[in-house]
């Protein structure tokens, strides 16, 4: 009787464990609150993606994430990849501070207190390389040519240090550089056969890549800083296509000056124009990042809007700086020859190009409604009128937060339409830019009081009719603060806006 009871108990336990055991989809563990702790206990290294089924970024990531999972599994790695539907598992999402989709966190040895945020690229190689850096040595020891070949073949970019004495000062500097780079595999070797295969007869560092010239040999004194600079200059293609997968490399890189070629892949002289762009890029490695954008692709239409371009105006070139202040520049010539692009880049670096400020034409009825319409051409005259207090919403037509605000802003306009010195206005910041105001987020609300000193006050109070009225009646004091909402860098990323009914969570990279 006892043995039968024990058997039933054991079977019940097995059934319960089986019910909670994570399922797999394309080699990715599917986790829920009921099996999350079990998965952490079973796997020392676990990368978890918190996603939403409707999220465009998550859909784009899915095949690369699965490819990375399959690659690690095939290698017999301890590392596993998992995913959590955060819209279903809200408790887990809240526990791990999920604010946007996808959010990806790395759990090591079951530590739930401080999982590492995944910040590298969205391609399978990026994911695998980042994980291997987190779980193994900074550089793999390459004992023979087969090991070197495997490392080079494993990724789009790989770096190998050739040192006859791997304990030398130069080798130590190389390892420090390897520790500082997340998304590129590093190898180190003292094997004479490996030296011979890659045509080295003395110590050196080589960056191998599956594009452009194929390899770059480091020259000069081997220091961590110089190696990192060398890698920065050579790890990306001369021209990189802007996609969902490459966006993190573009925005996450150290080069903050980007020149963009908007070119439809369907155009007859596509190869020639891209070739001219690539030829110009050769002279600006490490200084300006050359980016190609397929202007026909649906996901890229918002980027065209951001630069004030229409599909029929492409091919076209624009330059942007992503420092503290985002600034755009337009070539004086529409010619897309290598010579003209090179000249434009040189003139920019020499400080001889003025920023390009977009403006729509002024509508005839711009001041006929309670909310006045501002464009670049009339902004200065209206906003800095010394006799008027002007409250302006800087918006983007596609922004969900702006759409929510619209009816409230219209009511505010109605409230003050007959006021003698308060003006409520709005400006589409995707089509209009002004030198006096840098818009970093949507919507941005700024107050221009009736003074002669061109004062500008940020509003960051409640976005309610009462909140706005208190702010205006207090002379711009009650609710003043820094602007904070959808970052403009997101506007440059493809497929940023999801359906309106998904407005509860910001879609972040």
From Swiss-Prot:
Heterodimer; heterodimerizes with the protein microsomal triglyceride transfer MTTP. Homodimer. Homodimer. Monomers and homotetramers may also occur. Interacts with P4HA2, forming a heterotetramer consisting of 2 alpha subunits (P4HA2) and 2 beta (P4HB), where P4HB plays the role of a structural subunit; this tetramer catalyzes the formation of 4-hydroxyproline in collagen. Also constitutes the structural subunit of the microsomal triacylglycerol transfer protein MTTP in mammalian cells. Stabilizes both enzymes and retain them in the ER without contributing to the catalytic activity. InterPro entries: PDI_thioredoxin-like_dom, Prot_disulphide_isomerase, Thioredoxin-like_sf, Thioredoxin_CS, Thioredoxin_domain. This multifunctional protein catalyzes the formation, breakage and rearrangement of disulfide bonds. At the cell surface, seems to act as a reductase that cleaves disulfide bonds of proteins attached to the cell. May therefore cause structural modifications of exofacial proteins. Inside the cell, seems to form/rearrange disulfide bonds of nascent proteins. At high concentrations and following phosphorylation by FAM20C, functions as a chaperone that inhibits aggregation of misfolded proteins. At low concentrations, facilitates aggregation (anti-chaperone activity). The record marks 122 as: Lowers pKa of C-terminal Cys of first active site. Phosphorylation of Ser-359 by FAM20C is induced by endoplasmic reticulum stress and results in a functional switch from oxidoreductase to molecular chaperone. It also promotes interaction with ERN1. Disulfide bonds join 55-58, 399-402. PROSITE patterns: ER_TARGET (PS00014), THIOREDOXIN_1 (PS00194), THIOREDOXIN_2 (PS51352). GO terms for cellular component: endoplasmic reticulum; endoplasmic reticulum lumen; external side of plasma membrane; melanosome. Pfam families: Thioredoxin, Thioredoxin_6. The record marks 56-57, 400-401 as: Contributes to redox potential value. Keywords: Acetylation, Cell membrane, Chaperone, Disulfide bond, Endoplasmic reticulum, Isomerase, Membrane, Phosphoprotein, Redox-active center, Repeat, Signal. The modification Phosphoserine is found at residues 333, 359, 429. It catalyses: Catalyzes the rearrangement of -S-S- bonds in proteins. Its EC number is 5.3.4.1. A motif (Prevents secretion from ER) lies at residues 506-509. The modification N6-succinyllysine is found at residues 224, 273. This is Protein disulfide-isomerase. The active site is at 55 (nucleophile), 58 (nucleophile), 399 (nucleophile), 402 (nucleophile). Residues 473-509 are annotated as: Disordered. GO terms for biological process: protein folding; response to endoplasmic reticulum stress.
């Amino acid at each position: 009787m006892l043995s039968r009871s024990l058997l039933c108990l054991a079977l019940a336990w097995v059934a319960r464990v089986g019910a909670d055991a994570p399922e797999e989809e394309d080699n990715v563990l599917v986790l829920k609150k009921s099996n999350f702790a079990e998965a952490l206990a079973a796997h020392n290294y676990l990368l978890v993606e918190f996603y939403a089924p409707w999220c465009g970024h998550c859909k784009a990531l899915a095949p690369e994430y699965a490819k990375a999972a399959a690659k690690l599994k095939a290698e017999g790695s301890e590392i596993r990849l998992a995913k959590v539907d955060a819209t279903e598992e809200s408790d887990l999402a809240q526990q791990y501070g999920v604010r946007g989709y996808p959010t990806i966190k790395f759990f090591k040895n079951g530590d739930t207190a401080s999982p590492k945020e995944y910040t590298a690229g969205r391609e399978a190689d990026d994911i695998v390389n980042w994980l291997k850096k987190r779980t193994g040595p900074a550089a793999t020891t390459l004992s023979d040519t087969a090991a070197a070949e495997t490392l080079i073949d494993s990724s789009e970019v790989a770096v190998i240090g050739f040192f006859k004495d791997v304990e030398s000062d130069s080798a130590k500097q190389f390892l420090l550089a390897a520790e500082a780079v997340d998304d590129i595999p590093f190898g180190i070797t003292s094997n004479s056969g490996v030296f011979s295969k890659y045509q080295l007869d003395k110590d050196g560092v080589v960056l191998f890549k599956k594009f452009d010239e194929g390899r770059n040999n480091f020259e000069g004194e081997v220091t961590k800083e110089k190696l990192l600079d060398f890698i920065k200059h050579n790890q990306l293609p001369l021209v990189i296509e802007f996609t969902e997968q490459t966006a993190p490399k573009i925005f996450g890189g150290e080069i903050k000056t980007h020149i963009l070629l908007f070119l439809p892949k369907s155009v007859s002289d596509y190869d020639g124009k891209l070739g001219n762009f690539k030829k110009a890029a050769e002279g600006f490695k490490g200084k300006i990042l050359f980016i190609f954008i397929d202007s026909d692709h649906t996901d890229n239409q918002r980027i065209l809007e951001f630069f004030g371009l229409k599909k029929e105006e492409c091919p076209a070139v624009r330059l942007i700086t992503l420092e503290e202040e985002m600034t755009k520049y337009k070539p004086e010539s529409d010619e897309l020859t290598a010579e003209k692009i090179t000249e434009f880049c040189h003139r920019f670096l020499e400080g001889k190009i003025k920023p390009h400020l977009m403006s729509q034409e002024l509508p005839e009825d711009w001041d006929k409604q309670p909310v006045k319409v501002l464009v670049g051409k009339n902004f200065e005259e209206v906003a800095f009128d010394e006799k008027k207090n002007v409250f302006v919403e800087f918006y983007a037509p596609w922004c969900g937060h702006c759409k929510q605000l619209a009816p409230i802003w219209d009511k505010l306009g109605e409230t003050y339409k007959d006021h003698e010195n308060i003006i409520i206005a709005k400006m589409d910041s995707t089509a209009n830019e002004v030198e006096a105001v840098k818009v970093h987020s949507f919507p941005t609300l700024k107050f221009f009081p009736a003074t002669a000193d061109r004062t500008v006050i940020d509003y960051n109070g409640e976005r309610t009719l009462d909140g706005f009225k208190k702010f205006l009646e207090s002379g711009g004091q009650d609710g003043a603060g820094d602007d904070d909402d959808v970052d403009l860098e997101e506007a440059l990323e493809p497929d940023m806006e999801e359906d309106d009914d998904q407005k509860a969570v910001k879609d972040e990279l």
